[in-house]
UniProtKB/Swiss-Prot annotation:
GO terms for cellular component: host cell plasma membrane; membrane; viral envelope; virion membrane. This is Hemagglutinin-esterase. It catalyses: N-acetyl-9-O-acetylneuraminate + H2O = N-acetylneuraminate + acetate + H(+); N-acetyl-4-O-acetylneuraminate + H2O = N-acetylneuraminate + acetate + H(+). InterPro entries: Capsid_hemagglutn, HEMA, Hemagglutn-estrase_core, Hemagglutn-estrase_hemagglutn. Pfam families: Hema_esterase, Hema_HEFG. GO terms for molecular function: host cell surface receptor binding; identical protein binding; protein homodimerization activity; sialate 4-O-acetylesterase activity; sialate 9-O-acetylesterase activity; sialate O-acetylesterase activity; signaling receptor binding.
Length: 424
């Protein structure tokens, strides 16, 4: 009892001296088992090869360049590499995963499959993609890309139907119509194989609208059939619009196996790349840093939409991105957020990272790690320490029971002693 009272007293004294331990707006890690995926703002090789010694180009502290815990590529992103010919093989492994990328596919790039397409659909695709990546990297240690081999028995080749500017879609691949087909009302299939990983993220995409070709309108229809388990995954066009639609993608998490891609109308699509997920781990929320341009360019909030508790913590700066190298590279606010990678921290929460695990001015929500078990609330003159009441209630009950037992024993011995004196 004395030790408990002393702990409460010491904590209150600490509170009166102004020790708050507030959550800080950084990304950090419990220990050295972490990994960061990024772009030019954390690409040390780009700085060395293109901008020698000018580390102001990055938001990452250059002390981390030789850590071996970073997979970053200037001008790229995981989503961009997943879908397009502009490819970088992001590869990394860790218990705690941090993402600071995504800005290299935004409304600024204005990508759409056709001239009458919709970039809004591609922003939706981006959000759905990162949702799957973040959720799965909370339970997997390792991420990399793998090629998906497929076999199509026809003579037609894949076609670059979906392209805009410098971006050319190659995942999924479009198989062109066979020369002997007069229209797109036909069924066609291709085999593809997934092997070597625990699970895979693959795209299943359709044009969700009436696709016009030579005065005829078509409804897209695509399926993947797992020949080992009998499970089928499919999408059918449900919209009646004829303009303003685009390539809607769902991102499936599939096991290894032999699959059949099936098209009942329009062109056959088949996956050519997959995110390879390996090495299951205990649930560990990922951390995502907002990836956006200076306000002179249009950005999106899809990584924020995708990053939701409990599987993900989102960190952002409250000000416009204004770099010191140029307006899009070397921002002080985001440099501060990434500075947390220089040290270990015991506790992570929706509000931020806690540097200490004793008391805090803020109760951590969706907490992970060794987190404060007390909230230190300061009134103007009197520090009040509010603790989780359950341990105190249980201790009070135990003390009450002990007092009752002591009183009963005292009464018993007093009565017994009086009886013996009377007998004497």
């Amino acid at each position: 009892m004395f030790l408990l009272l002393r702990f409460v007293l010491v904590s209150c004294i600490i509170g009166s001296l102004g020790f708050d331990n507030p959550p800080t707006n950084v990304v950090s890690h419990l220990n050295g088992d972490w990994f960061l995926f990024g772009d030019s703002r954390s690409d040390c090789n780009h700085v060395v090869n293109t901008n020698p010694r000018n580390y102001s180009y990055m938001d990452l502290n250059p002390a981390l360049c030789d850590s071996g815990k970073i997979s970053s590529k200037a001008g790229n992103s995981i989503f961009r590499s997943f879908h397009f010919t502009d490819f970088y093989n992001y590869t990394g492994e860790g218990q705690q995963i941090i993402f600071y990328e995504g800005v290299n596919f935004t409304p600024y790039h204005a990508f759409k499959c056709t001239t009458s397409g919709s970039n809004d659909i591609w922003m939706q695709n981006k959000g759905l993609f990162y949702t799957q990546v973040y959720k799965n990297m909370a339970v997997y240690r390792s991420l990399t890309f793998v090629n998906v081999p497929y076999v199509y028995n026809g003579s037609a080749q894949s076609t670059a139907l979906c392209k805009s500017g410098s971006l050319v879609l190659n995942n999924p691949a479009y198989i062109a119509r066979e020369a002997n087909f007069g229209d797109y009302y036909y069924k066609v299939e291709a085999d593809f194989y997934l092997s070597g990983c625990d699970e895979y993220i693959v795209p299943l995409c359709i044009f969700n609208g009436k696709f016009l070709s030579n005065t005829k309108y078509y409804d897209d229809s695509q399926y993947y059939f797992n020949k080992d388990t009998g499970v089928i995954y499919g999408l059918n066009s449900t919209e009646t619009i004829t303009t303003g639609f685009d390539f809607n993608c769902h991102y499936l998490v599939l096991p290894s196996g032999n699959y059949l891609a099936i098209s009942n109308e329009l062109l056959l699509t088949v996956p050519t790349k997959a995110i390879c997920l390996n090495k299951r781990k205990d649930f560990t929320p990922v951390q995502v840093v907002d990836s956006r341009w200076n306000n002179a360019r249009q950005s999106d909030n899809m990584t924020a939409v995708a990053c939701q508790p409990p599987y993900c913590y989102f960190r952002n700066s409250t000000t416009n991105y204004v770099g010191v190298y140029d307006i899009n590279h070397g921002d002080a606010g985001f440099t501060s957020i990434l500075s947390g990678l220089l040290y270990d921290s015991p506790c992570f929460s929706q509000q931020g990272v806690f540097r200490y695990d004793n008391v805090s001015s803020v109760w951590p929500l969706y907490s992970y790690g060794r987190c404060p078990t007390a909230a230190d609330i300061n009134t103007p003159d009197v520090p009040i320490c509010v603790y989780d009441p359950l341990p105190l209630i249980l201790l009070g009950i135990l003390l009450g029971v002990a007092v009752i037992i002591i009183v009963v024993l005292l009464l018993y011995f007093m009565v017994d002693n009086g009886t013996r004196l009377h007998d004497a």
